[in-house]
């Protein structure tokens, strides 16, 4: 029997090509038009998106991107490319490509590169530790949609998530412990996850449970009393209720409870991006300090840390053997 030619597709959310209103508008239009992300009727949503949201938000969000943009480009893309390079170096016998659900490098090009190399078994690795219909399922949809254009399909191994994987928890633990060594132990360690509308969870999305699974596993490994480790949700958008407690409201309330020193990590982000570097590290730090807090330290995402690449390699090799 002919041996399968293996390949890996790493997928993250995406980013604008530049920190400009025009580039941000293109990116947000693609992102917010995905029915997995916003499931409001297109007849209602698209006029609102194009007529109100994009014209107002694009210049505002572009300024935020400008504050975190790196010499090499968007932080999310920079760190994702470093992850791809590091994983490819670990597995030189297997082609590894990076694609973004929205923006560039796009998924069709990444898949085309892999199939052009003769890949017959494809491992799809969404870089989302906790499954959600708005992220991981959107990757599934996109890959299936792209492959409809091919006559000859590869077999697919889809990594749904890795919320409790021992190597993932170990990498998070190491990041937290490094922060404790550098800054001392805080009064509270805050685990801030990206939020989703409560309605999505009520309709069956198990994302909240997967966030709780990660938090529970990490609490068991961290040298702090369990009551000093908190879980919150950030980045809410729109008017409907999202998962609570909200990160910003929690940070605003902590100083009045005697909490003066916090450290915050975002376990659901595999790479630093606008939501971690600007929303958390800058905006939410200001919220905490303005409310009377004294010390705030942001613990970076796993990015291309060795422990993170160890995890990604283990995930892929486990699925290649399936």
UniProtKB/Swiss-Prot annotation:
One Gene Ontology cellular component: cytoplasm
Pfam families: Ferrochelatase
Protein localization: Cytoplasm
EC number: 4.98.1.1
Biochemical pathway: Porphyrin-containing compound metabolism; protoheme biosynthesis; protoheme from protoporphyrin-IX: step 1/1
Disulfide topology: none
Residue stretches spanning the membrane: none
Sites where the protein binds Fe cation: 194, 275
Keywords for this protein: Cytoplasm, Heme biosynthesis, Iron, Lyase, Metal-binding, Porphyrin biosynthesis
GO molecular function: ferrochelatase activity; metal ion binding
SUPFAM superfamilies reported in the protein's UniProt record: Chelatase
UniProt similarity note: Belongs to the ferrochelatase family.
PANTHER family named in the record: FERROCHELATASE, FERROCHELATASE, MITOCHONDRIAL
Role this protein plays: Catalyzes the ferrous insertion into protoporphyrin IX.
The protein's name in its UniProt record: Ferrochelatase
Name of the gene this protein is made from: hemH
């Amino acid at each position: 029997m002919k041996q399968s030619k293996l390949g890996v597709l790493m997928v993250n959310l995406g980013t604008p090509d530049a920190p400009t209103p025009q580039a941000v508008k293109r990116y947000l239009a693609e992102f917010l038009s995905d029915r997995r992300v916003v499931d409001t009727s297109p007849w209602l949503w698209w006029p609102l998106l194009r007529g109100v949201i994009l014209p107002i938000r694009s210049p505002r969000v572009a300024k935020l991107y400008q504050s975190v943009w790196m010499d090499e480009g968007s932080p999310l893309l920079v760190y994702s490319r470093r992850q791809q390079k590091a994983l490819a170096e670990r597995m030189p016998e297997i082609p590894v490509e990076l694609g973004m659900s929205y923006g560039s490098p796009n998924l069709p090009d990444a898949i085309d590169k892999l199939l052009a190399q003769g890949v017959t078994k494809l491992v799809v690795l969404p870089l989302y530790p906790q499954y959600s219909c708005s992220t991981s399922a959107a990757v599934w949809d996109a890959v299936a949609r792209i492959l409809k254009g091919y006559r000859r399909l590869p077999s697919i191994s889809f990594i749904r998530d890795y919320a409790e994987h021992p190597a993932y928890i170990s990498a998070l633990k190491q990041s937290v412990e490094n922060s404790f060594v550098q800054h001392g132990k805080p009064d509270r360690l805050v685990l801030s996850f990206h939020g989703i509308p409560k309605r999505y969870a009520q309709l069956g999305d198990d994302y909240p449970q997967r966030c709780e699974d990660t938090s529970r596993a990490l609490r068991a490994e961290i040298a702090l009393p369990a009551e000093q480790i908190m879980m919150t949700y950030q980045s809410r958008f729109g008017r409907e209720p999202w998962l609570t407690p909200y990160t910003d409201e929690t940070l605003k309330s902590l100083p009045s409870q005697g909490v003066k020193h916090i450290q915050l990590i975002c376990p659901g982000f595999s790479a630093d991006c606008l939501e971690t570097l600007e929303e958390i590290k800058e905006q939410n730090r200001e919220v905490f300090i303005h409310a009377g807090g004294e010390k705030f330290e942001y613990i970076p995402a796993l990015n291309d840390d060795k422990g993170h690449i160890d995890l990604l390699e283990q995930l892929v090799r486990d699925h290649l053997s399936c």
